[in-house]
Amino acid sequence: MSSSFFIKTKQNPKLAKKGKNTAVSKRKVAQNDGDSAGKSKVPAKKPSSKYNEEISSDSETESSAEPKKRQTNVDYEYDETPQEKKLRLAKQYLEQLKEEEEKKAEDESFETELIAGRLQEQVLEQKGKLQRLIAKDILPPDASEIRVLRGHKLPITCLVITPDDKCIFSAAKDCSIIKWDVESGKKLHTIHGGRKGTEDRHVGHTAHILCMTISSDGKYLATGDMNKLIMIWEAETCKHLYKFTGHKGPVSGLSFRKGTHDLYSASHDRSVKVWNVDENAYVETLFGHQDIITGLDSLSRECCVTAGGRDRTVRVWKIAEESQLVFHGHEGSIDCIQLINEEYMITGADDGSVSLWSVNKKKPLSTVKQAHGCHGDAGLEQPHWVASVAALQNSDTVASGSHNSQIQLWKCGHNYRGLEPLFSVPLSGFINSLKFSSSGQFLVAGVGQEDHLVILLTYSISAGSVRFV
C-alpha cells in the first residue's frame, strides 16, 4: 500500500505527463543497463517504478516552479502592474485635489477677510468715523520735485481733480477753464473766456470764475462765476450742456452730492440752492446765513456744509429735513471749508486760524491760531489769513494755504481731537485753492497773484513712507 505522503491531490496535467515521459525514459535506460550487465553474476536491484514516477514528477515540478517564482519576484521589484499604476495615479490625483482644496480654502479665507475689511471701512465711512492714519508717513518735498503747469493769464481761483485722478480742471479770473493731463502735464482742452457783454453769443464764462466741482462719476463739471451763472459741462469732451440762473449774487460755492447728480450751490446772496442736473431743473432754496457764503462742501449724505464769511458761522444744512445747524468759533471771516468725512470738517479764516469741527459739536474740537505765522512790524503784527483748505478724505491728513505763499500740512489727532503741524511747502504767490487726489497720491495747488500757476505736489508710498516726487 503506497503512502499518502507521495500522493499529489492536485497536479498540473502537463507536469504529470512530463513525469510519465521521464519515468518511461528511465525504465528504458534501466533495461538497457540490465542487458549490458547480463554478463554480471549479481543482478541489479530494480527500483519501484511507481515511487520513481511520483518522486521524479514532484522534483520536476519544484525545479521548474522555482525559477518562475524568482522571475516573478524580480518582476514585482522592477515592474508595475496596471492595477498598481491605477492605484498610484489615483493617490496622486487625490493628493492634488487635497492641495487644491486647501489652497482654495486659504484664498477664500483671504478674500473673506479682505471683503470684511472693505465692508467695515464702508460702514465706518458712512458713519463718518473712518480715519486712515497716513500723516506720519508723509515727507516734505524738494523744490526740484514740484511740477508747475502754466496756461492761465490771470490768477487761478479754483480747481478740481477728476475721480480717476487722470485730469485736472482749473479756472481763473481770465474766465477760462483748462483741462490738464496729470501724467504729462499738457493741456487737453481750453474753454476760453469771453468779453463782458457777449453773454448771448459766447459759449462759456464772461466774468471771473469763482468755484467749480465735478460729479463723483466724472460725468459733469459745474462752474460758477461773478455773473450769478452756473455752467454745466460734459467733463469728458468739455461740451457745454446747461446754464443755471437763479442766484442774485456771485456764485461762490458748488458741490455735487457723492453718488448722485444733485448739485448744491452757494452765493453772495446768502442762499443755498439745490439743482438736479440730470433733469436740468431747480429744486429748492435754503436761507439762513447773515452774510455772503464763502465756501460749500458735501459728501454722500443729503446735506451740505457752508462757511458764512463775516457772520462767523459754519452751517450744516439737512436738505430732506429743511433744517440747519449753526456753529460758532472763529473770530474773523470764515473763508474756506472742507469735509474730512461725514462727521468732521476743517475751516480756515482771515484771522489766521485753522479749526477742526465735528458736526455733533457746536464749537471747534481744535483751533490753531496764527497757523501760517504773522507779518508786520513789531507790535503791529497781523496773522497771515488762510485762503484755502483741503482734506484727504477719511484720513488724518489736511492742508491749508495762505497768502504767505506757503502750504501747511497738518496731522489730525486721534478721533480728530487735535491738529499737529507736519511741514510747510514754500511756493510763490497766493494759495487760492487746494485739492487732494481721490487716491491720496498727490496734492494740487492753484496759485494766484503774479504767477497764475497750477502746481502738482505728487507723492508715492514706498517701504512704509510717503514722499512728494
Task: Place the predicted regions along the sequence by residue.
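Loop/turn segments within WD40 beta-propeller blades
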Residues: V160-D165, A171, M212-G218, G224, ...
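Structural hallmark of WD40 beta-propellers
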Residues: K166-F169, G218-A222, M231, H240-Y242, ...
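Conserved strand-to-loop turn within each blade of WD40 beta-propeller repeats
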Residues: A171-D174, G224-N227, A266-D269, A307-D311, ...
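WD40/WD-repeat beta-propeller blade N-cap
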Residues: L149-I156, G193-I209, T245-V251, F287-I293, ...
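Short loop/turn segments that connect beta-strands within beta-propeller blades
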Residues: V182-S184, A235-T237, V277-N280, K318-E322, ...
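WD40-repeat beta-propellers
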Residues: I177-D181, I230-W233, L254, V272-W275, ...
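Blade-level signature of beta-propeller repeat domains, shared across WD40, Kelch, NHL, RCC1
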Residues: S437-V469
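Intrinsically disordered terminal extensions that flank WD40 beta-propeller domains
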Residues: M1-L154, L457, F468-V469
